[in-house]
């Protein structure tokens, strides 16, 4: 499978290590409409069915983090029955250091 960023591949390898199922870019959520069409979409990087959570990973610059955080905030407001989480660089590396399934799940859910 081709990923948009190497960090996504490493993320899935760690999930696979603990048999945590994942789906890559499973769905897109409309965030803004106008003139009869969708103007803005949010496509999370992953959906983890066993935790019922959508994950967006960003290990890049602060500008992207702020933009993604705003999208997640809007998605959470528009889709209150869905759980979204942004994993920043610090959380990402913390996730990769977890060495058992429970700790991995807690790192994602926290």
Listing of model-derived features with the role each one plays in the protein:
Residues 1-110:
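Electrostatic, structured charged patches in enzyme active sites and in nucleic-acid/phosphate-binding
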């Amino acid at each position: 499978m081709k990923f948009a960023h190497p960090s996504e591949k490493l993320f899935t390898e760690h999930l696979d290590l603990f048999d945590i199922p994942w789906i890559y870019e499973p769905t897109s959520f409309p965030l803004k409409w106008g003139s009869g069409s969708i103007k803005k979409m949010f496509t999370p990087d992953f959906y983890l069915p066993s935790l019922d959570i959508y994950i967006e990973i960003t290990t890049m610059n602060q500008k992207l983090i702020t933009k993604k955080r705003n999208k997640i905030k809007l998605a959470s407001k528009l889709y209150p029955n869905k759980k979204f989480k942004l994993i920043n660089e610090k959380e990402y590396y913390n996730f990769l250091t977890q060495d058992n399934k429970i700790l991995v799940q807690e790192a994602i859910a926290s």
